[in-house]
Amino acid sequence: MPRPRKSLICLQDTPYYHCISRCVRRAFLCGEDHYSKKSYEHRRQWVEARLIKLGSIFAINVCAYAVMSNHTHVVLHVDRDEALSWTTHEVLKRWHTLHKGTNLTRQYMQAEQRSLLSDSQIESVIATANIYRQRLHDISWFMRLLNEFIAR
């Protein structure tokens, strides 16, 4: 029985992980579908571009990957220390390239708006940034954002 990634990943043991993501119900990720005779080869570039983009945003390096007709293999290196070294501004900038963020985080990113924030609002932004920081070196979030983008 499959186990969730959070119970399989221990960064103290190794920062390198091999992740596999499969298509279901005879769906084709790329290549030619033998049943419908449609070509999905253009999707290979989508997957590659998304991997490169996520690798530049996350504190996760893509060491190797293979995009097969109905699944992908990705070898990842999690650089937790890099994520912990980022400033709050850097974390929010990276997160906002993928997500909208909250009203407070968007205000914080604008220098003229940041000066108007109260101390409690800034504390809230820092707490939110720490959540984002954890996500930006989490393999589950990396794979989620890769697969959701391709599925849509």
Language-model segments: what does each one mean?
Residues 1-152:
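Short catalytic/metal-binding and nucleic-acid-binding patches
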